[in-house]
Every structure is written in structure tokens, then in C-alpha cells.
Amino acid sequence: MVFKRKLDCLSVGFDFPNIPRAPRSCRRKVLNKRIDHDDDNTQICAIDLLALAGKILQESESSSASSNAFEEIKQEKVENCKTIKSESSDQGNSVSKPTYDISTEKCVVNSCFSFPDSDGVLERTPMSDYKKIHGLMDVGCENKNVNNGFEQGEATDRVGDGGLVTDTCNLEDATALGLQFPKSVCVGGDLKSPSTLDMTPNGSYARHGNHTNLGRKDDDEKFYSYHKLSNKFKSYRSPTIRRIRKSMSSKYWKQVPKDFGYSRADVGVKTLYRKRKSCYGYNAWQREIIYKRRRSPDRSSVVTSDGGLSSGSVSKLPKKGDTVKLSIKSFRIPELFIEVPETATVGSLKRTVMEAVSVLLSGGIRVGVLMHGKKVRDERKTLSQTGISCDENLDNLGFTLEPSPSKVPLPLCSEDPAVPTDPTSLSERSAASPMLDSGIPHADDVIDSRNIVDSNLELVPYQGDISVDEPSSDSKELVPLPELEVKALAIVPLNQKPKRTELAQRRTRRPFSVTEVEALVQAVEELGTGRWRDVKLRAFEDADHRTYVDLKDKWKTLVHTASISPQQRRGEPVPQELLDRVLRAYGYWSQHQGKHQARGASKDPDMNRGGAFESGVSV
């Protein structure tokens, strides 16, 4: 069903404000009542309650009793209005008050009504109470003359904030009926919008007009405030323009000005949270938007809103990168071999292990990283490239302690190094040649580099009886080593297991030469095809790179090569004469293999050779 608006037809050069609709339940009841009592009026108007009020006012003009009650209530209203005006002038207002020029025949009246919970309240309310509730009285007018229940006279200047008048109705009656009364301006019985010209807003609200800002502060450093827009009547706009503006406002957010102020003067005011259904029928300028301001850790304010929020007003916090938290429980150390007697005590075993570890780590240590049991050697890779992240299972990550490689090279040249002149460096000399103690002058001329290599540089530990004050220019500093204590037990640290590269390498392919093929054929003719170890000892005893398996494989290759045509043969060529001998020996030993195994091989090789000649096999 389409609701027909009747505001445009009553327009006399200005637009009426939109009246908020009642809930659907109340509107449904009003519709049913109007259909039952008035069959002629079939159209539904949005301001039925305002029309009902007009009818009641017309009835009040004809009734003298109602006019008398009206005069009594008027006097009470005038007294209340004076007290309110005096209080408002003393307190002041944070929002500027615009000035309006109003003729002497104009007065300000409350004439916009809120809907009650049901229409039964209005039906049971007498005329005098109805006028008393809705405040159909003038506020502080001069030249008081009663005419049709209204006062005529010149209204005072600055009657309210933004053209609004303070409600002077009795609060007890309003509370009893549960009604709310929005304010508007009535001029001569007709509603008019206040003039928006020559308005002087406050400086703190330069970009927001004449608004009211209320707020409340909680104990948890959260600030809640809602910004109530003023009830200014806008100029008339066609439904098409309103529909376009509504669609545009839903697609794009509006920018919140940077100099937006948050006033906390009214601390005791509660924030108003509206639901969607309660805002039904309101225009965009009548809605109250609730803003929420909280403090972020970096002391910057973040503004959020229940109505509309500017995307530029939210400060994004910097995103922290993902960190990897490691919990190292143990380190792996290289394997150590320690020899101790069975009669040794546990304390001596501990000392021995401690000494072994000290010797291992005396030259410095370095940390190794193991991932899935494999050592990570590239130190320039990132943790994510290596596979170390907070999402992965860090149980596959390990660390090792390794001795740092020796950085001091062993000088094997015979050139004389520079003699240090600092006396402190002389005490750090670790060893000297045995010839230094023999008293032979110029002993360094006797030392040869070849002798040093052959003797593996047996160095004597540093002797404490050598005088530091009398340095000898003939001595040579070979390798600086720290002072070692000689122990009875030998400690041999094992750094790494040696890699056997020679076993891991693939064997080099060595093809048989013609001489080796001839020796193989001759040995097979004499010994047969089932004694390959004897063939190895007979013909290839000195050839370590030839095994009996190699000889057997080569014999099979020769038999296959001799049985095919010369065009199909591959590899190094073999003389045809040798291939013919291979075929004759293969045929002979294949026929007599069982008979020779039963009789046993003869110890004399010349007899076997003679048997081969008798069978027609040529050597």
C-alpha cells in the first residue's frame, strides 16, 4: 500500500516538517478505526493526529467552558514561562542564538506532537487536559489580548535556540501519558519554518551549524558522545531528488571534518541508542548519530560511529611482523673419545670429560644450525626461506657447538720473520727448536724446511727458565700455542668422521685391451668356464683392477659379440680370430662341463691342454 503525502497541497510558499510516524501497531489501529467510523475518507494521511487536533481546536472555539479553562491554564503558563526565561538568561547557552524578526501579530506555539502508545488516550482525555498537555499557549508575549484562545502581540527576541521554544507544559501530565513533544514554530495558527538567514553560529561549531554536542565519559577511558543535529526545516525537494540523494549517501561515506569537537560539558546525559524501527519515518537531518571515541595505545583518537563513519578518520596502527620464538634446551657437541681405566673414580671421570671439553672449545666455538637433521650452510638466507617460522614445527630445528677452525697458518718457509720488539710479546712464545738448548750458535741456519716437514714439527713446550730480559735474535717463533699441562691420560677429541670419498665415487670404466682379451680366452680354454677365480689367478694375478666378476662378464660379452653379425657389434673391435676361438671354447666346455665336474679337474694343465687339442679347439 502506498501512503499518499498531503504536505505539498497545504504548502503556502514553504514546506512543512515531516512528522515521525507511530509504530506499525498503532497505525494499524488508527486505520481500522477510521475505516469503521468514516467510510467516505478512504485515503490514509500521515498527519491524522494533527488533523484530529485541529478538529478539537474548532470545537473549543464554540464551547465557552473550554475557553474559560483555557484562560486559567494560560495564566499558569505565563508564570512558568517567565521563570524559565530568567533561568535561561542566567545560565547561557554554548550554542549561539539566532535573531528573528517577527511581526506583532505572530506568536510562538508548540504545535508538533508525538504519537502516544494508543489512540485511546486521546479519546479519554478531556479538552482542557489536552490543551494543557500539548502546550497550546503563547510564551511571554506583550499586549496580552485573548482572541480565539491565542495571545496576540510581539514576541520577544531570542525565544529559543535555533527557532525552538522551551517546552512549558506541565511535566507531571506529560509523564503520566508518556508523550514527547518536538518543538516547532506556529505563526498565526499556521506552521512556518524559521528563517535561516543571518545566523551567527558559535566558533567551535563553525562547520557544523547550530548543533548540540552531548557526551559522557566512562571509567575505562572510553568516551561516548552523540551529536544531535538541529531541527532546521529544509527547503522543498522533490521525491526524485530525495531518492537520488539517499542512494548516493548510502554508496559513499561522508568526510568528518578534522576540527570536529568533542564537548563533555553535559556529563550526566545518557547516550541515546536507537534501533532501526524507532527511526522509521525520519529524514536524514532528523537522525541523531552516536559517536564513540576510544584511546588507542599510541595516544591517538579513533572515532567510530553507529550511523556513518568517515574512512579518513580512523588511524591504522602499524602491523607488526611475525616473530619466531625459540626455546633452546640443549646443544649438540661433536663426538668425544675418552679412555679411562676401570679403577678410576667418578670424580676423575668428570674431570677428564671437563678437560676434553675445555680442549675442544679452547680455540673458540661457533654455532651451527640444523634443520631436519641437515646443516644450514648459507647464512644469508632468511628464516622464512630456510623454513623456520612460527607456523612450522620447531622441533625439527637444532643447534650444534663446533670448534672454530684454526686461523693461524703454519709457516714452512725459511725466511726470517720480523723479531718483535715488544717485551710482552716475548712471553707469549710457545715453543722453540731443540737446537736452541744445544748452545750451537746460528742454529737456524741448520734447520731446513724439508726436515721440518719430515719430523712433523715436534715442538717443545715453552720453558719458564728462558729469560725475558735477554731475548735472543736467533730464535724463531714457529707456531704460537698456549701453555699445556701434561697429563697421564691421553685425551683425543674427534671433531668429525672422515668422509670416504674414494668409496663413494663410481668406478672408472676401463675397457679390455686386445692383449687382455687374448689372455682371457687362453685361460678359459685351459681351465673352463666354471673356474673364474682360477682364471683370475692364472691370467690376471697382477691386475688389481680386474676382479673375477669382471672376467666372467667380459666372457659373456665376447660370446654374445661372436654370435652376432659384424654390422651389429658395438664398442671396441675384437679380431675375428679371437672371436672364433671364443665360439669353439664355449661349445666344447658346454658339452663336457658335466663330465669334467664328475671326474674332477686334472692337476696337470698340460693334459687338459692336450685334450683340448684332440677335440679340435685351436689355441
UniProtKB/Swiss-Prot annotation:
The places in or outside the cell where this protein is found are:
Nucleus
Write out the ranges of the annotated region (Disordered): 593-619
Alphabetized, the UniProt keywords read: DNA-binding, Nucleus, Transcription, Transcription regulation
Keyword Signal (UniProt) = no
What is one cellular component GO term in this UniProt entry? Answer: nucleus
Ranges for domain Ubiquitin-like: 324-403
* Tagged with keyword Transmembrane helix: no
The record's listing under SUPFAM superfamilies reads: Homeodomain-like (SSF46689), Ubiquitin-like (SSF54236)
Q: GO: which molecular function terms?
A: DNA binding, bending; telomeric DNA binding
Q: Which residues bind DNA?
A: 532-559
Tissue distribution? Expressed ubiquitously. Highest expression in flowers and roots.
* Top-level taxonomic group: Eukaryota
The chain positions of domain HTH myb-type read 504-563
**Entry-linked InterPro entries:** Homeodomain-like_sf, Myb_dom, SANT/Myb, TRP_plant, Ubiquitin-like_domsf
Q: What does this protein do?
A: Binds specifically to the plant telomeric double-stranded DNA sequences. At least 2 repeats of telomeric sequences are required for binding. Induces DNA bending.
How this chain assembles, per its entry, is: Homodimer and heterodimer with TRP1.
Put simply, this protein is called Telomere repeat-binding protein 3
